[in-house]
Amino acid sequence: MKMTEAQEFLTPTKGVNSSKFNINHGHFITNLENQESPSKLGAYTPGKYSTSRVIESLHKQIDELTSTNLKMTSQCHQLVNELESSGKKQNKQLETISRLQTENMNLNAILDRKTNRMNELESSLKKQTVFNEDAAKKNLELEETVKKLSLENEKLTEQSTLYKIQYEAIVDAHQSYKQFFTNETSTLRNDLMSLKQSMTKQLESKTKEVLAIDEKIQNKLESLDSAQESFKKHASEQIEDNIKELRLDSWQSSLREAQALLKEYKSQAQAEGITIQEQPKASIPQLRNPKRKTSGQKRTSFYGTPTGFSIPSNKQTPPSSSSTQLPGLKRASSIRISSDPNRNR
């Protein structure tokens, strides 16, 4: 069924959310609770109230409720209109906010660019200031230099006038000496040509001698380099042969076996009640590698051997036969303690 316009007007919740009436709904309920109703007045007694009064009171309450409903409905429409207008305002404000945000972002980007440009300009300004200060200092120095040069120029001008007078006197004397020196110059020119030819011949002969000496020196250096390489090779081969003759690996294995036998002998002696006093072991001497000479130490002379090497000798010192003991071991002296005489019986 379709509602009439009056019913739609009297219906406050038509097309409106119930949350919109929360503001005035509390006041309406409070007014209803404060009004007296027949149920609040206690049980009805025919002696106190009549039916007409009850009906009148009910009509009054209905009229009051109707007027209150009309007021609430009008307030509801007003609130709806205000809500719609506030929604439109909010949409406009949101659009304005978004537009202002985009403008703010653009302005921030522009501000960042301007800030960067300002920093660049400040740095360039500092550099230019330093450059200007340096230029000002140089300008002051140049001004002082100009002053000094102007003073020197004045002195030189005075000297030039004096020199001019002297020059005129010298020119006069030169004319008289010119003829004499012309003759002398011709004779000296002839002597110079002959001297030049003789010096050229001597220079050519000396150059040939120097080239021959240089060639001899180069040959000597090459022979010294080859002798140095052969000495290095011979020394390395001799060192390897000496290491092979020493047979360090077999000596180390023999040393380990001797140490094992010594430990076994000590354990047996301690089991028999014999104490052994050990002397400190001698350390095995380390093999020394031949010292390497740097290129700065291998200085050679034109007619001698390299200063960093000596002539190798083929003589080898044989190992001493008197020391038959292995290196690192010494005979430990044992002292017998008096044991039980009945033990060996």
Curated annotation (Swiss-Prot):
Composition skew (Polar residues), residue ranges: 297-315, 335-345
Region feature Disordered, mapped onto this chain: 273-345
Stretch forming the signal peptide: none
Compositionally biased tracts (Low complexity): 316-325
Compartment(s) of residence: Endoplasmic reticulum membrane
Keywords: Coiled coil, Endoplasmic reticulum, Membrane, mRNA transport, RNA-binding, Transport
Pfam families reported for this sequence: SHE3
GO molecular function: RNA binding
Chief location of this protein within or outside the cell: endoplasmic reticulum
A GO cellular-component term linked to this record: endoplasmic reticulum membrane
Keyword Cell inner membrane: no
Topology relative to the membrane: Peripheral membrane protein
Family designation: Belongs to the SHE3 family.
Function noted in UniProt: RNA-binding protein that binds specific mRNAs including the ASH1 mRNA, coding for a repressor of the HO endonuclease. Part of the mRNA localization machinery that restricts accumulation of certain proteins to the bud and in the daughter cell. Required for the delivery of cortical endoplasmic reticulum into the emerging bud.
Name of the protein in question: SWI5-dependent HO expression protein 3
Species whose genome carries this gene: Kluyveromyces lactis (strain ATCC 8585 / CBS 2359 / DSM 70799 / NBRC 1267 / NRRL Y-1140 / WM37)
